[in-house]
């Protein structure tokens, strides 16, 4: 069984053009994500999946591996699946999808998210949740919230605050979804064959496709947050976090 991290990376963006190549404390953001992924103990390989030669060039410059994918991929997950096939991954081989805008994530997150699949490939798909400590993230639609059952299976993901405390007198954690997924190649093949879901279209969240079609997502609660770079002004905050590490 192989465990390969694939980092989908797009050059074009309406909010942040060339984001993967933005410098974070002197290194391209994609390099920082790549290096952290490679540091996970469970990983047997790392690759960047992109449709842009500029990103391929940047990755190869720091000694990384890049896979060119079609520019017709409808989502980052489809791009990851295409790259996985190009890399020769099949069956119960595990693909870890790490978003390319998380330059300070802890490598332990990859070991945590892959553990259920390594133990039981029939699990299919896993992801991470983090108990929110910053109140702003409770209501910010950029931070996706999630709920899961007593066995850790995801029930829903939303940009809204869930669950809603109607009476305002309950003590409970609100969980933020972190953009790290692991799947078997068999699961990815099924997922990518499905039409876009109705809830997926509304919330603009790919993972809802799995839930809408009855495919389970096992949730692992992690102690490690994974702040994202959404806009250029986020870089200073990320660089400050790097100094503290």
From Swiss-Prot:
Gene Ontology BP terms: CMP-keto-3-deoxy-D-manno-octulosonic acid biosynthetic process; lipopolysaccharide biosynthetic process
Q: What class of enzyme is it?
A: transferase
- Give GO MF terms, alphabetically: 3-deoxy-manno-octulosonate cytidylyltransferase activity
This protein's encoding gene: kdsB
What's the catalysed reaction? 3-deoxy-alpha-D-manno-oct-2-ulosonate + CTP = CMP-3-deoxy-beta-D-manno-octulosonate + diphosphate
HAMAP family the record matches:
KdsB
Its annotated pathway reads: Nucleotide-sugar biosynthesis; CMP-3-deoxy-D-manno-octulosonate biosynthesis; CMP-3-deoxy-D-manno-octulosonate from 3-deoxy-D-manno-octulosonate and CTP: step 1/1; Bacterial outer membrane biogenesis; lipopolysaccharide biosynthesis
Q: Spell out the protein name for this chain.
A: 3-deoxy-manno-octulosonate cytidylyltransferase
């Amino acid at each position: 069984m192989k465990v390969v991290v694939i980092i989908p990376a797009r050059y074009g963006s309406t909010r942040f053009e060339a984001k993967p190549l933005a410098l974070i404390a002197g290194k391209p953001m994609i390099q920082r994500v790549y290096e952290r992924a490679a540091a996970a103990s469970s990983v047997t390989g790392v690759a960047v999946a992109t449709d842009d030669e500029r990103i391929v060039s940047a990755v190869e410059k720091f000694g990384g591996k890049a896979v060119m994918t079609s520019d017709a991929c409808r989502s980052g997950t489809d791009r990851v699946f295409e790259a996985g096939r190009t890399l020769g991954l099949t069956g119960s081989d595990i693909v870890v999808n790490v978003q390319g805008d998380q330059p300070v994530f802890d490598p332990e997150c990859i070991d945590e998210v892959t553990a259920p699949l390594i133990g039981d490939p029939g699990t299919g798909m896993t992801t991470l949740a983090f108990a929110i400590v910053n109140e702003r993230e409770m209501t910010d639609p950029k931070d996706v919230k999630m709920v899961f059952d007593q066995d850790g299976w995801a029930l829903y993901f939303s940009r809204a605050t869930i669950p809603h405390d109607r009476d305002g007198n309950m003590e409970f954690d609100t969980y933020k979804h972190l953009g790290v997924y692991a799947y078997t190649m068999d699961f990815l093949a099924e997922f990518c064959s499905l039409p876009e879901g109705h809830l997926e279209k509304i919330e603009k969240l790919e993972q809802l496709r799995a839930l809408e079609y009855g495919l389970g997502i096992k949730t692992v609660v992690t102690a490690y947050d994974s702040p994202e770079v959404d806009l250029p002004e986020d870089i200073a905050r990320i660089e400050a976090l790097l100094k503290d590490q």
